Design a protein with these regions (language model features):
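Short amphipathic alpha-helical segments that mediate assembly, nucleic-acid/protein binding
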Residues: 5, 27, 119-120, 211, ...
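Short coil-to-beta transition motif at edge beta-strands of beta-rich domains
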Residues: 142-157
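Short solvent-exposed strand/turn elements
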Residues: 173-198
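N-terminal intrinsically disordered, low-complexity, charge/repeat-rich segments that act as generic
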Residues: 2-107, 243-264
């Protein structure tokens, strides 16, 4: 009997990881399928966009130094990503191959139960079968976050590292302000002392306060390792007195759009 996507995800025995990946895939799939233009796009085009956006976050695990992330966690991540994407009608040959290799590695390490071992061929067959996009878009999930006002957070985008301060939480989204610093290695709280706030240059040539409601930043710690807590209980964020003010309090975005905006 064929195995279902949810059955595979349950066999991974990693509820938190699966929840995070499934939520990210559904968020990206929803946005890619919204609007009148989406109906004119080929499923393969939508799939390419979704996979690229999802991997912007989860490559922090898939491409991590083995000394920093346990190999079995990487394998579970690869398999969960492939299954969640396939469930929404998307597939990537390279990720599918990584997921199949993960099945072999997880079995070799006896990391999961006998049912996973017995159904391994069925899981591979599922992943290599044509992915069919569901007729209905994924629902918009209710916003929530485990991050708190006063948290200072490191953020990885490709091979660069940024940091921001959570000013407050509003309607399930952290309101964040970035420190004006970026470097190729992870930041530490000590490196942020005296660093001013990063501004946004507008058409008038002036630098303005740049704050964002960052939806999709939910889990703490972050299972994707893209966001890391550097400090907590920090009442004062980066100094922004050098920046001009405008009428808006903050811009609404999410972790994927913000990540794209920060790409080198």
């Amino acid at each position: 009997m064929a195995i279902k996507h949810l059955d595979v995800l349950k066999l991974l025995a990693a509820a938190g990881l699966v929840e995070a990946i499934d939520g990210d895939v559904k968020r990206c799939a929803l946005w890619a399928r919204l609007g009148p233009e989406a109906a004119k796009r080929e499923p393969a085009q939508i799939g390419t966009e979704v996979i690229e956006n999802v991997l912007l976050r989860w490559n922090c695990i898939l491409q991590a130094d083995p000394a920093e992330v346990a190999p079995l966690y990487v394998h579970k991540t690869a398999l969960a990503l492939a299954v969640c994407l396939h469930r929404q009608g998307f597939a990537d040959a390279q990720l599918t191959d990584a997921a199949v290799a993960a099945i072999v590695a997880l079995n070799a390490a006896v990391a999961l139960n006998d049912t996973f071992h017995r159904r391994s061929a069925d899981i591979e067959a599922l992943l290599r079968s044509p992915a069919a996009m569901p007729a209905r878009r994924p629902p918009l999930l209710k916003a929530h976050t485990a991050w708190r006002a006063g948290d200072v957070v490191g953020m990885q985008v490709a091979d660069r590292h940024h940091a921001f301060h959570v000013r407050e939480v509003s309607q399930g989204a952290p309101i964040v302000e970035f420190y004006d610093i970026v470097q190729p290695s992870p930041l530490a709280w000590e490196q942020l002392q005296g660093v001013i706030a990063r501004g946004q240059r507008l058409n008038d040539g002036r630098q303005y306060v740049d704050r964002h409601a960052l939806y999709g930043l939910q889990h703490q710690p972050d299972p994707a390792h893209q966001f890391r807590l550097l400090a907590s209980g920090i009442a004062q964020g980066p100094d922004s007195t050098h920046l001009a003010r405008h009428s808006g309090l903050y811009a609404v975005t999410d972790v994927f759009r913000m990540t794209r905006d920060l790409l080198p």
